[in-house]
């Protein structure tokens, strides 16, 4: 390959993280081709960019039921939509110009918006590229489907079957798993990771991606977990949200010194793999990337209040496979975890299920398949 362009969109962190994971896997593979990673929204007009991100966040946070309805309705209509893709093209002319000038040999999309623009350019014979589409959820929504030929990378066999039912040839589908940072494929000993990050060895460790919750919901989640009957350390990762970290730090300071449950706030970190390896459970919103990272180290995922749509469908898959539990009522979150801890055989089985489902090498598998596809004339 001589030129690869990876395109994503910052609508939720998962799409960007998947793109970065693939770019990193290309670098680790020793590939000599040019590999660039761009956020498609950087090549959109400012108003469209703001509307595209803000509308999603606002609807998810304030009207989740409406978002779920919209998500399901789009599934019924997506194959026949004309106005929305045309509106996207109208507002992403700099992206279209980039693609026409760059003419990458392969385009890899981890979000459907740039994928549909590339598909249109290919149909209009303005772009000659091999298109790859990497779905970042366990489920496949029809909005990912493109009219022009493309190779699809999906998380599970069920997604493959869904695509085949929609007319995609089996040879155009690879069940790769969801690409996560290749660092999650490296074995790590839990005790060593606890020592490295100053975590307790005498307690279960619960990892929370606190940034995925609203401020008020974080308070409820932590208040419930502090009622655990088992000795536990709660590690709340707050990312770059300094206000959230300060709030969790204050809550941690209010925990009595003799409490069996302790709380630790972590700001922005590049060691999520190490914190995940150190943990017993991952608690959070069921994004495809976050759940895949938990599976990589065989951790049971505790799903909290999934929004209707992709989060609910993601959680359904792990619940069906016995690798997750779900809590819809935050006051009983501690009860549900305590109940699982009291059933050792069930806990062991769920951890085994998580390891069975894990695809920690997904990013490298995507890259290897892309290199094979490029070697085939066409």
Annotate each language-model stretch with its function.
Residues 359-378:
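C-terminal alpha-helical cap of glycosyltransferases
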Residues 21-102:
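Conserved N-terminal ligand/cofactor-binding loop architecture of enzyme catalytic domains
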Residues 18, 69-167, 172-175, 181:
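Active-site and donor-binding regions of nucleotide-sugar-utilizing enzymes
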Residues 191-192, 199-278, 312:
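Donor-nucleotide binding loops and adjacent catalytic segments primarily
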Residues 346-360:
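A short, well-ordered alpha-helix in the C-terminal region of glycosyltransferases
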Residues 275-313:
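A donor-sugar binding/catalytic signature common to diverse glycosyltransferases
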Residues 321, 329-346:
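C-terminal "capping" alpha-helix adjacent to the active site of nucleotide-linked donor transferases
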Residues 150-212, 240:
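A nucleotide-sugar donor-handling region in carbohydrate enzymes
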């Amino acid at each position: 390959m001589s030129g690869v362009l990876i395109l994503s969109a910052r609508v939720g962190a998962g799409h960007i993280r998947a793109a970065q994971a693939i770019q990193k896997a290309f670098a680790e593979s020793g590939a000599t081709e040019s590999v660039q990673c761009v956020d498609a929204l950087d090549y959109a007009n400012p108003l469209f960019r703001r509307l595209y991100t803000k509308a999603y966040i606002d609807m998810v946070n304030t009207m989740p039921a409406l978002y779920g309805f919209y998500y399901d309705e789009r599934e019924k209509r997506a194959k026949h939509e004309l106005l929305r893709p045309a509106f996207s093209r109208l507002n992403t002319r700099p992206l279209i110009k980039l693609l026409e000038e760059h003419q990458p040999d392969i385009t890899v999309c981890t979000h459907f918006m740039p994928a549909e623009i590339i598909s249109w350019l290919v149909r209009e014979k303005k772009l000659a590229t091999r298109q790859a589409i990497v779905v970042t959820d366990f489920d496949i929504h029809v909005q990912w489907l493109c009219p022009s030929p493309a190779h699809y990378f999906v998380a599970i066999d069920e997604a493959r079957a869904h695509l085949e039912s929609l007319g995609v040839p089996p040879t155009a589908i690879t069940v790769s798993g969801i690409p996560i940072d290749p660092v999650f494929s490296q074995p790590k000993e839990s005790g060593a990771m606890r020592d490295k990050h100053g975590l307790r060895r005498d307690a279960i460790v619960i990892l929370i991606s606190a940034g995925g919750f609203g401020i008020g919901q974080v308070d409820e989640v932590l208040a419930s977990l502090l009622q655990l009957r088992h000795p536990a350390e709660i590690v709340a990762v707050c990312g770059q949200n300094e206000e959230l970290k300060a709030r969790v730090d204050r809550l941690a300071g209010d925990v009595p010194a003799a409490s069996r449950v302790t709380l630790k706030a972590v700001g922005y970190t590049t060691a999520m793999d190490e914190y995940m390896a150190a943990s017993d459970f991952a608690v959070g919103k069921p994004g495809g990337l976050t759940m895949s990272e938990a599976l990589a180290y065989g951790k049971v995922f505790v799903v909290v209040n999934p929004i209707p749509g992709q989060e609910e469908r993601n959680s359904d898959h792990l619940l069906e496979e016995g690798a997750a539990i779900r809590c819809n009522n935050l006051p009983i979150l501690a009860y549900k975890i305590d109940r699982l801890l009291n059933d050792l055989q069930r806990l062991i089985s769920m951890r085994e299920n998580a390891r069975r489902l894990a695809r920690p090498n997904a990013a490298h598998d995507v890259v290897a398949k892309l290199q094979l596809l490029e070697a085939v004339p066409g």
